[in-house]
Amino acid sequence: MPCKRTICFIIIALSLKLIHAVRQRGTVIRFDFLGILLITYYLSLITYQMSTQPKIIVLDDDPTGSQTVHSCLLLMQWDVETLRLGLADDVPIFFILTNTRALTPTQAADVTREVCQNLKSAIAAEGIKDFLVVSRSDSTLRGHYPVETDVIATELGGFDAHFLTPAFFEGGRITRDSVHYLFIDGVEIPVHETEFARDSVFGYSHSYLPDYVEEKTGSKIKAEDVERFLLPDIRSGTQERLLSLQGNQCGVVDGEKQADLDIFCQDILAVAAEGKRFLFRSAASLLTSLAKLGKQPIPAEKMAEYKPTSKPGVVLVGSHVQKTTQQLGELLKQPGVAPIEVDVVRLRDQPGERETMLQEILSQVKAAYDAGKNPVIYTSREELTFADVQQRLDFGKQVSLLLMDVVRGLPKEISFLISKGGITSNDVLSTGLGLRSARLLGQILPGCSMVRTGESHPQFPNLPVVLFPGNVGDKDGLATVYGRLSG
């Protein structure tokens, strides 16, 4: 299809020809004026179209993918009418929180399929023509790849390529020469050498992304067939190469700093304007470059301004990765906290004690709150073993249900809620708080989003909620966020 600039020049040429024709008929003033109006109208239209970004639709497998943007909508439901809210919103990006990382591969595929089918109806109803689709997932390569991207490609079809872009600079994740690294205590570690690669559900053996793709696709995509977009390529421009891609070609993308993805996304958007269609399997930093939203309204250090009361707040810690455990230890050293442990071994071994456990936890929360303390509710830290992945997922749901009952039983005038862990945060938004959608305020710490409930929320109106991923931040990260909100 011709590009918008070409169309613009054609319109100008035709308009000038019209003016010339009417000059020869002797009605110069009247038709010159009409011709100028015609040119102005079409130039304005084309300029608007050229400056308008495509809608960026993010299917987020937990609620932390918005950790580099602000002001957009997070949708906890995906019926057609709710999706239309996101599509019609003035902000160019919105997130659909599918929480598929907490599901089995089959369940993840079913949810993704339902979202895509509803999206097709919502896109048609809103008359959206230009859009990009991002399957947002973990910057440490955990998640249902290629299950989700395969379903998206089938349902929304016609993609020329899909790209893996796992760089997340705020969290210390970079990609160089197609190898994905984590910074741990200032040292670059190939991601396959970290605890995340040993995840009992999403484990893997490779940091070299083409090999990771071959491993995860069961050799359906060979490593040698993966297009590698290296730093020198990106920094010198990739438009011609992007234009040549077709047939949902798999590509992997380097990134050492945000400027690298800025350049890459500039080329992506230019080529997309020519009619190419791309799908992304991405961490959060790509979204910064695609959305181009600028600075958030209130800086991180001053986000306590969003608190509706001066009462104590609550911290809920569900994530059990080593980084979270370290951060929890530092948090519990802070003044004004009241530690409340949820004994998950007791829940597993004595499921009949669940209601008793719930009442015990809520009693401790009330006592701490009444004493002016900030309750820190956290699951016991031992990593439990199960016979298979399904048993582990099922028990994880039982833990989550208990924690969400705790959320629903919190004092109504708490001033903030910090949720630690991606899956925990999703459940807090969709189940504990029962939200259909929420507006993102921004980041209170690099990689940590804050949203706020609406004024009409039946239990916690205008409550700021921090979505803190389990694998983000240094050892003082959780204590820093707590300090910014409790001070």
Which residues make up each language-model segment?
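Cap/lid and interdomain-hinge subdomains that line or gate substrate/regulatory clefts
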Residues: 52-60, 67-70, 82-85, 92, ...
